[in-house]
UniProtKB/Swiss-Prot annotation:
The species this protein was found in: Mycoplasma genitalium (strain ATCC 33530 / DSM 19775 / NCTC 10195 / G37) (Mycoplasmoides genitalium)
Entry keyword set: Coiled coil, DNA-binding, Restriction system
Classification via Gene3D superfamilies: Bipartite methylase S protein, DNA methylase specificity domains
Role description: The specificity (S) subunit of a type I restriction enzyme; this subunit dictates DNA sequence specificity. This bacterium does not encode the associated endonuclease or methylase subunits.
Superkingdom field: Bacteria
Gene Ontology biological process: DNA restriction-modification system
This protein's name: Putative type I specificity subunit S.MgeORF438P
Family: Belongs to the type-I restriction system S methylase family.
Single GO MF annotation: DNA binding
Region (Conserved region 2): 331-370
Domain notes: Contains two target DNA recognition domains (TRD), each specifying recognition of one of the two defined components of the target sequence. The TDRs show high structural similarity and each forms a globular structure. The two TDRs are separated by 2 long, conserved antiparallel helices that form a coiled coil structure.
Conserved region 1: annotated segments: 143-182
Phenotypic effect of disruption: Not essential, it can be deleted.
Region TRD1: start-end pairs: 1-142
């Protein structure tokens, strides 16, 4: 449950320069030979994710840092000791009694877009430390209010971190199970009592078991922002909704062109098959669609690589129909085997949706708590 904020709206909020609250120090260069995959500490430089690992650190945990070269403006609060690279800048509190660390982090995070706007350069962007020092951020001297804001936002971040971990664990488990299932790993089949697959599984083309349908063009203005039936085109996620679907539920789609060419999707509700997508509808009721969805997801990387090697990458209905997938005639075996991987895939999708939804809520709340000073009194009453 999200804690209810009890903020004093009459507290005098002000703007303070970053330089008046923090001691800023630019990171150090790390020699390439000191970067090792087995290193004890993360090495953060110009990217949002770590740039590798190393066996030494130069910054203690619970330190705020801002990227000043590369992915400029990204604000991070480290929970472990790390090596701060030269494209990073650390911000240490000048007076911990005046400013709560997590409140300081969220105050900076709320201004991340403004920090990003300080960047200059065409190829590799940079932020001048002098410009960063002069940037003003929202500040209140009331420690109770600082703690209330920090604690509330921390609840969201802890859940987001937990979800990210669950997503990674479930993705690895799903991929491992799919590999063992479709490569007919003897120990795996024995554990799940699927030994019959050893003799019954063989390859078949998609065109022998599915009907194919090209996506239909639909103007963006004809799509709805909200609705019951999602519109899927050449993007992995839906890009709007429609009043009437053109494809049934329990179907598969393959993205046929664009950046996400070859990506596989499963549809558990009726949907609109748009431009850049190919719908796969089972020919009969003896096909357990999730089994073939899992098989295609297992083959997805190979499919994408084959398509990208073409001078003009495009997946036609003919080529889609020629894709070979593992097949077993028994519907019961399809169902029993497919469910093992499919349930993990559904759980993974559930975690991803929760992560996306919670991120939007957290970011909205962050902006509500740290808006422009002229707007704060009005908007904070919503919470």
């Amino acid at each position: 449950m999200t804690p209810k904020l009890k903020l004093n709206n009459n507290i005098n909020w002000t703007k303070r320069t970053i330089d008046s609250l923090f001691d800023l120090k630019k990171g150090e260069m790390l020699e390439k030979e000191l970067i090792t995959p087995e290193g004890k500490y993360e090495y953060f430089n110009g990217g949002v994710k770590n740039s590798g690992r190393t066996d030494k650190f130069n910054t203690f945990k619970n330190t705020i840092s801002v990227i000043v070269g590369g992915s400029c403006g990204y604000v991070r609060l480290a929970d472990k000791n790390f090596f701060c690279g030269q494209s990073n800048c650390t911000l240490n509190l000048l007076d911990p009694l005046e400013l709560d660390l997590k409140f300081a982090y969220y105050a900076l995070k709320s201004q991340q877009e403004r920090i990003e706007a300080l960047a200059f350069g065409t190829t590799i962007q940079n932020i001048r430390i002098s410009d960063l020092k002069e940037l003003e951020i929202p500040f209140t001297s009331n420690k109770n209010e600082q703690h209330a804001i920090a604690n509330t936002l921390s609840v969201f971040d802890e859940r987001l971190e937990n979800l990210a971990s669950l997503i990674e664990i479930n993705r690895k488990l799903r991929d491992e199970y799919a590999h063992k299932l479709f490569s007919l790993d003897e120990a795996f089949l024995s554990h799940w009592k699927l030994e019959a697959l050893q003799s019954q599984m063989h390859e078949i083309t998609l065109g022998e078991i599915f009907n194919f349908k090209s996506g239909k063009y639909l103007k963006s203005e004809e799509r709805l922002e909200e609705g019951k039936f999602p519109y899927y085109g050449a993007g992995i996620d839906n890009t709007g909704f429609v009043a009437e679907p053109n494809t049934e539920k329990d179907t598969i789609s393959i993205i046929s062109n664009g950046y996400s060419l070859g990506n596989i999707r499963y549809h558990e509700i009726p949907w609109f098959n748009g431009t850049g997508s190919i719908a796969l509808e089972p020919m009969n009721n003896e096909i357990y669609v999730p089994f073939f969805y899992c098989a295609l997801k297992y083959l997805q990387k190979d499919i994408k690589e084959r398509m990208k090697s073409d001078d003009s990458p495009f997946l036609s209905l003919k080529l889609a129909g020629e894709i070979k997938v593992p097949y077993v005639k028994s519907f019961q075996l399809q169902r029993k085997a497919g469910k093992i991987v499919f349930l993990l895939d559904q759980k993974l999708d559930q975690y991803k949706k929760e992560l996306s939804s919670l991120t939007v809520i957290r970011d909205t709340l962050l902006k509500k708590l740290f808006p422009d000073m002229t707007e704060r009194t009005k908007s904070i009453k919503d919470y």
